[in-house]
Amino acid sequence: MNKKKRRVAVLLSATIGSAVLVLSGCSGKSDQTEKTLRVGVITYTQDDPFINGLTDELKAQLKAMENKERRIIVSTKSGNDDQQEQNEKVEEMIDAGCDVLCINLVDRTAPSRIIRMARNEDIPVIFFNREPVREDLMQWEKLYYVGCDAEQSGIMQGEIAAEYINSHSEVDKNKDGKIQYVLLEGEAGHQDAISRTEYSVKTLMKNDVILEKLSYQLADWNRGQAENRMNRLISQYGKKIELVMSNNDEMALGAVEAYRKAGYVREEWPVIFGIDGLEEALEAVKAGEMQGSILNDRVDQAKKMAKMAVELFEGEEFDEESLKEGRYYFSEYQKVDGSNIDEYLNAEETISHSEM
């Protein structure tokens, strides 16, 4: 090969190598003076605002942990509400050379294939938001969970709802001494939905709120589905609905949208409570369209996952005091209502701007 052809070949090889580095996601390589941590993040869907916000915050936290000796590459994929598809995406991440996997399961009862694939390649897994069954998480010492205690969120939601109802007699519109309510439930068989539903209602009753159930409706954590369910309930019950309890803010916002479109004046609306502390829900609380939410602290969870990913990669010891049974990290929920909405809304706006 003459020198000109050899030079072209070398340049072409370098160009291809650079392209591979840029496009390879988990498989990207760094120079020899720095280590590269490759983190694969696989969510159950790409249509959940809370999960999207948590993923963005995780990427920001990992970016902040880069230094001269450590580069961090984050690749994200969605399971699109299909466990089989999520399994395939996990396999792709493993084949691409990821060092740590952060997985938000489609089906919390079906992580076996993911665990088997990760264990075969000795890749630690941090499950988040959707807690696997305990027996599955205990299969291997490199499996972890980061999230919140769903029971706590249900209790807190019941507490802020009871406090509001007990101090606002106008909630009982028909003055029958009972609060007629509907409940928007996230997903059939989902542990968080079950716990939030059970403990929110129990806590209301424990705090001397006499309830009359009009309807429970499954809406799959989805705003559009919740709006459709509420449209039917409004047609059926009209102004009889005095309270809407929702397993998450997205569905609560669906209820808000239904009442906006129904033509009711604000005084005719029921009181509405959600869970997650989404910025749009906090704005609805500020506007008086919702009466409260329970903040699911995505920043705290993202910080913990990022720290764990780096520690696993570096082979460092965990702070065992922060992990229950050496496997679980639960961040604390926080109550948000009219009394502290400005504090949390300002904090949420700051977080949102930092993620841009």
Model-derived regions, located:
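Short, low-complexity disordered leader/linker segments with a strong preference
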Residues: 1-38, 94, 116-123, 352-356
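Hinge/cleft segment of the Venus flytrap/periplasmic-binding protein
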Residues: 35, 46, 177-188, 192, ...
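Extracytoplasmic "Venus flytrap"
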Residues: 40-61, 65, 75-88, 98, ...
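Short, solvent-exposed amphipathic alpha-helices that sit
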Residues: 50-66, 153-157, 191-210, 225, ...
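Hydrophobic alpha-helical
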Residues: 58, 103-120, 125, 200, ...
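Short beta-strand elements in bilobed, periplasmic/extracellular small-molecule ligand-binding domains
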Residues: 64-79, 183, 205-220
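Hydrophobic alpha-helical segments within soluble ligand-binding/sensing domains
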Residues: 86, 145-176, 226-227, 277-281, ...
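Flexible loop/hinge segments that line or gate small-molecule binding clefts
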Residues: 114-152, 176-177, 278-286, 291
